C-alpha cells in the first residue's frame, strides 16, 4: 500500500482508498496528519532554524524545558535522542 496523503486520523493510498490510521507512526505521528496549527508551527520554525541537535539549545526548546519542569518531574527537564537515552538518564 502506497500512502499519498493524510488528514487528521485518515490516510489515503495511491488508489484513493481511505484508511483509518490506527498505527500512528512514530514520535509525533500520534498527533494526526496535517493539523493546521501543527503545520503552521512547523513552518514557522523551519523558516527560522531547522535543526541543531541536542548539544546546543534553542529558544523554543528552552521554553518547552521550562514548561515541562514547571509541571512536575522535580523541576527538571532533559532532552535526548532516544528512548534508550531517556531510560539511562532516568536510572
Give the residues covered by each predicted segment.
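Active-site-adjacent loop/helix segments that line or gate small-molecule/cofactor pockets in enzymes
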Residues: 1-10, 55, 61
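Glycine-rich loop-to-alpha-helix module at the N-terminal edge of alpha/beta enzyme cores
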Residues: 18-91
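Short loop/turn microsegments at loop-to-beta-strand junctions
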Residues: 6-9, 15, 26
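Generic preference for hydrophobic/aromatic residues in regular secondary structure cores
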Residues: 3-5, 11, 66, 76-77
